[in-house]
Amino acid sequence: MALYEHVFLARQDLSQQQVDALVEQYKGVISANGGSVGRVENWGLKSLTYRVNKNRKAYYTLMDLNCPPAALNEMERQMGLSEDVLRFLTIKVEAHEEGPSAMMQKREERSERGSFGDRDRGDRGPRSFGDRDRGDRGDRPPRSFGDAGGDRGPRRPREGFEGGAE
């Protein structure tokens, strides 16, 4: 039997219990056809990069499969017919990864880091908003209103043009 990693996206308007029921349904399909399901990870409701069937978000689920190709084909056929499954992707692997997937590790790192305001700013010191009125780094002198700036000097008047701003 071959080893596969299978990810599918379920509609955003489903509840977590309905997504779990889908997982159980597809586990049953794999076991009925002589395969087994290892790790199952629910990555939760995540934003999609672009709309898929009028959905901006979807429930992501990863399944590690050990099954014959016929079992996988049957599961993918049923997913294609289901209105609850937006997309799915199956990849054949040499061996299943031990421990949590990269997506779950990212989630754990985020929870350890805390919110934006808690992050360490290193040698920059605490963030202050009092110097934001000029919008520069503070290493240049302020410009006066009519100053052209740079090395160009004043602008010469246009030839052959009557009137103007001068």
From Swiss-Prot:
- What's one GO-annotated cellular component? cytosolic small ribosomal subunit
CDD domains xref list: bS6
Q: Which GO terms describe its biological process?
A: translation
| GO molecular function annotations of the record | small ribosomal subunit rRNA binding; structural constituent of ribosome
> What sections of the protein cross the membrane?
none
Region (Disordered) residue ranges read 96-166
- For bias type Basic and acidic residues, the affected ranges are 96-142, 149-166
Alphabetical keyword list? Ribonucleoprotein, Ribosomal protein, RNA-binding, rRNA-binding
Sorted alphabetically, which Gene3D superfamilies does this protein's record hold?
Answer: 3.30.70.60
Sorted alphabetically, which InterPro entries does this protein's record hold?
Answer: Ribosomal_bS6, Ribosomal_bS6_sf, Ribosomal_S6_plastid/chlpt, Transl_elong_EF1B/ribsomal_bS6
Functional summary from the UniProt entry: Binds together with bS18 to 16S ribosomal RNA.
The family assignment reads:
Belongs to the bacterial ribosomal protein bS6 family.
What is the protein named? Small ribosomal subunit protein bS6
Protein source organism: Mesorhizobium japonicum (strain LMG 29417 / CECT 9101 / MAFF 303099) (Mesorhizobium loti (strain MAFF 303099))
